[in-house]
Structures are given as structure tokens and as C-alpha cells.
């Protein structure tokens, strides 16, 4: 299940950008300052917009997802700005003047990937595995920068979170698209962390009864299991180091699939 993030909330229950940026684990002070400037720019551009809160929230979610993958600061800034560009709150030309060409190039690459919706058959069940694989290959061929694909995966996860309370047909449509295209794409790229979260949400939306049944059988919450694994991995690493064994040790909780 999805980890609950609260590091960016202050005592009054309000969003605290300084606290949020500090929680992302960005080592460079300059990078933190640039992200703070980008956040301020997003606030300015969305002022008075009816969907301001939603667009800002979506960008925050995407940045948090990408920060767990230790993506560079340009990727994080592009992710924060992407919802605004995608909703045409601010044009790419204006962004190019404000934040630079490199970030706009990333945003443009992510937006180009939306064209794939015209090629996949998530509205029905007639799509073949060969067609789906062709779509995935096309996605990879459409972008010149790997970071665009990773941002798109983060955007799809944010979307799946967003439609949690939406009508069933909207949830199912989003889940089918991610099941057919984006979860396998994350797997092909070796980004297991994003693949597991995509699959968790898709299973929840496509098979709600089974999801609830399995969830009920799991006595440990995912966060508890993650904490247990972290402790176990730490202990195992220490023991292996004491024995002079050089090895990489890692673990993860199983998903519901």
C-alpha cells in the first residue's frame, strides 16, 4: 500500500514548503533553493485558478515520488511544473523564459507521451498483448530523455491516487491503461518501486473485492512490514560486515498481486 506522507505538514495542518523540501533528502542547498523558487513560481501562476489546489498537490505528489528515486533537480522541478503546463495554466514559451530550456524540454517530452492514448485500447478488452507491447516500444521511442518516462510514470501514480474517490468507470479506465502500458513499462525499465505502486492501485481498482479480501488477511500494515524489513536488512548488513562479507542486501514488502 501507499506510504502516508506527512513530513510537509506543519502543526496547523497547513502545507509547509520549507519543511517539505527538507524532507526530500536533497543534499545540495542550491538545489533546495531552486526547488523553492519553482514552488513560489507555481503559487504565483496558479493564483486565482479554480483548480489551483489540485494542480499544486499533483506536482507535490510527483516530486515526492521522484525524490525516492534520487532524481536530479531539473527532473524534480519539471515534475512540479508539469501539471501547470499540462492544464495550460502557463505555456511552454512562457516557461522557457522563466525556468529555462532544459526543464521545458523535459515537460514537452512528458506531454508528448499523452498521444499514446490514441493508440491503446483501454476503453475495451480487445487489445492484444502484441499491440500493448508495440505501444510500450513506441512510448520509449517517442522520448529522447529517459527522465521524461520516469516523470510520466510518477504522473500516472499521482493520477491513480487522485481518482481513488472518482466514479468506478473512471478508476477502471485509469487502471486498465496503467496495467497495459505503464506498469510493464516501469518493469522493463527496472524501476520496481514505481511498478509495485502502479500494480497495487490497478489491482485495487480492477478487483476491489479480491483486494479487500487479501487486505483483510494481512495482519501487518505495509508500513509495519517496511519497518521490519529495514531493521532486518540493517541487522543482516551489520552481521555480514562483521564477517568480512561484501554484499548488497535489500528487501521489499510483497504487493497484493
Predicted regions and their residues:
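Active-site helical microenvironments for divalent-metal-assisted chemistry
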Residues: 1-257
Amino acid at each position: 500500500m501507499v506510504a502516508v506522507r506527512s513530513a510537509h505538514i506543519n502543526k496547523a495542518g497547513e502545507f509547509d514548503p520549507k519543511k517539505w523540501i527538507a524532507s526530500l533528502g536533497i543534499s545540495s542547498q542550491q538545489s533546495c533553493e531552486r526547488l523553492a523558487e519553482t514552488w513560489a513560481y507555481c503559487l504565483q501562476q496558479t493564483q486565482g485558478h479554480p483548480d489551483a489546489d489540485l494542480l499544486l498537490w499533483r506536482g507535490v505528489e510527483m516530486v515526492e515520488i521522484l525524490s525516492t528515486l534520487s532524481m536530479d533537480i531539473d527532473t524534480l522541478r519539471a515534475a512540479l511544473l508539469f501539471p501547470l503546463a499540462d492544464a495550460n495554466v502557463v505555456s511552454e514559451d512562457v516557461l522557457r523564459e522563466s525556468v529555462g530550456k532544459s526543464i521545458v524540454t523535459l515537460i514537452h517530452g512528458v506531454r508528448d507521451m499523452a498521444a499514446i492514448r490514441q493508440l491503446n485500447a483501454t476503453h475495451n478488452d480487445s487489445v492484444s498483448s502484441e499491440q500493448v507491447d508495440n505501444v510500450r516500444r513506441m512510448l520509449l521511442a517517442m522520448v529522447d530523455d529517459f527522465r521524461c518516462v520516469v516523470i510520466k510514470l510518477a504522473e500516472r501514480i499521482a493520477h491513480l491516487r487522485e481518482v481513488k474517490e472518482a466514479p468506478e468507470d473512471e478508476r477502471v479506465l485509469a487502471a486498465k491503461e496503467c496495467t497495459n502500458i505503464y506498469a510493464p513499462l516501469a518493469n522493463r525499465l527496472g524501476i520496481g518501486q514505481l511498478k509495485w505502486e502502479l500494480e497495487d492501485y490497478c489491482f485495487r481498482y480492477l478487483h476491489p473485492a479480491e483486494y479487500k479480501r487479501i487486505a483483510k488477511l494481512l495482519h501487518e500494515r505495509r508500513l509495519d512490514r517496511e519497518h521490519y524489513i529495514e531493521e532486518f536488512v540493517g541487522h543482516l548488513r551489520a552481521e555480514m560486515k562483521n564477517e568480512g562479507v561484501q554484499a548488497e542486501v535489500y528487501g521489499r514488502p510483497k504487493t497484493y498481486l
